[in-house]
Amino acid sequence: MGKVLGIDLGTTNSAMAVYTNGEAAIIANKEGKNTTPSIVAFTDKGEVLVGESAKRQAVTNPEKTIYSIKRIMGLMCEEEKANEAKERLPYHIIDRNGACAIEVAGKTYTPQEISAKVLMKMKEDAEAYLGETVTDAVITVPAYFNDAQRKATKEAGTIAGLNVLRIINEPTSAALAYGLDKKEAEQIVVYDLGGGTFDVTALETGDGVVEVLATGGDAFLGGDDFDNRIIDYVADEFKSESGIDIKADVMALQRVKDAAEAAKKELSSATETEINLPFITADASGPKHLVTKITRAKFESLIGDLVAKTIKTIEAVLKDAGLSKNDVKEVVMVGGSTRVPLVQEEVKKFFNKELNKSVNPDEVVALGAAIQGGVLAGDVKDVLLLDVTPLSLGIETLGGVMTKVIEKGTTIPAKKSQIFSTAEDNQPAVSIHVLQGEREFAKDNKSLGMFELRDIPAAPRGVPQIEVTFDIDANGILTVSAVDKGTGKSQEIKITGSSGLSDEEIEKMVQDAEAHKAEDEKRKAVVEAKNQADALIHQTKKSLDDLGENFDANEKAGIEAAIADLETVLKDDNATKEQIDEKVKALTEKSHKLAEAAYAKEQGGQQGAADAGKKADDDDVIDAEVE
């Protein structure tokens, strides 16, 4: 195997490194820079510019200059974040089969294609630097990226001519680069605030092992959002002075964006900066110039709520990991936006300890990816990465309940199976609805996909055994399969169509799950009671039909009346578990003699109605049915 390229494919900038001569080293691009802007531009002459050259011409070509494409990777157009992206980004975002894509000069490009152009440049620059062909790569992604986003990232690599050996999480990669796996076992937190995404991950490291304990973050929080706060402030000030809305002029807005980014960087070392943009626009009275001063205090007031949001995420991650602030031995700062003084101050204040800033925050993730490349190439020994799935995975079962197959926080790769059955007699097919989240009901969780297992042989409900298997590979990409154990017929789906969960959504799901826990459990108890009652009615009616005239007419009438009472309660959407249980008890008592009569029959074999709805003896069979 040749050299493996470690790539940090960032929202704002990307970096690359390689493991050679016993250490990871950053590879400079052809321009001599250690980072490459993740920007692609299309010129009127049909040229495609990537990196610095694309960034330089953005002011004169804003609608054909594509930046922050990572923000719409795997995003569905119906999502709220898609509307935010459309409002903020100057290029044309369109709907392509439900997913976000972009349109430039009448041509449609997917986020994968745009990202691939950045990766192609990096591959070419690496080959020029190393003097050899590079085909293998390890690419990093935010820890909360879902299956579709991870697969899209891998596809971008493939389009760029790379063989993507592994997709790994950015904070895990950073921990490797800091050499934290070489120390004694300890708990660390990686705080990763980049240009467009934010990640907090709690890890346990030591003795060559890096294990993720919990992760959180936001796909729409980063340096871009800090820039946007400055842009909004400057635009509002200019409008109040001149009456002109410069946001309506894409070329003027691009100039303000560039100035805002520069001001943000200057305020990391200076206490005041000036934005000076002559001839920004014009009206009937002549040209207008934009000149305004911004102090660090003003900047911090503009972004204070965003920084506070990151602290809340730290609290949630520590809670999920079962750690206190005092348990954390190292706080590692990653990402260019961690240079902002307010960010450092608030994180330091929260943990009450000095922060680890010993490695360049723009380069650390790429260095870690190169080390993982060395592991895969066999050049690095005794290093093991253990990542986790950020949310539970499961399927929808009878009554709209989500039945979990893989629990949140499970170390990946992971493979787990459960046995389900049919909900109706002679049911010819089952629909497998794959879900992600922490709520009790399917509708409250994220839908990842759906498929059907067909041609199930005719059989009574509960008889067919459908084995559903969830398989998450080391890249975090999920495959779900279903097998009819009676016939061997199978079907599977690789989850690729979902839009991706931002960690904001993940955090909201967890919070919602906690807030609605009592309510959800109450609703779930009603659904389970209804399912059990329905099974009891089904079995009782079947026993009555089997016995026919051999059963006492008065007893039969009493049972039928009890069935009718129970069916009436089941039709009531507002029925409580207690009301259902009361009618179930009445029918069960009435059915005792029916059970005795059934067992007394010579052919036997009929199960008593009182046992209906109980769990099968097979420990692998769970008490849930697939609609």
Swiss-Prot record:
Residues modified as Phosphothreonine: 197
Acidic residues bias spans: 618-627
One GO molecular-function entry: ATP-dependent protein folding chaperone
Any matching Pfam family: HSP70
UniProt keyword list: ATP-binding, Chaperone, Nucleotide-binding, Phosphoprotein, Stress response
InterPro entries: ATPase_NBD, Chaperone_DnaK, Heat_shock_70_CS, HSP70_C_sf, HSP70_peptide-bd_sf, Hsp_70_fam
Induction of synthesis: By stress conditions e.g. heat shock.
NCBIfam families given in the database record: PRK00290.1, PRK05183.1, prok_dnaK
Protein name from the UniProt record: Chaperone protein DnaK
Biological source species: Sulfurovum sp. (strain NBC37-1)
Lineage: Bacteria, Pseudomonadati, Campylobacterota, Epsilonproteobacteria, Campylobacterales
Encoding gene per record: dnaK
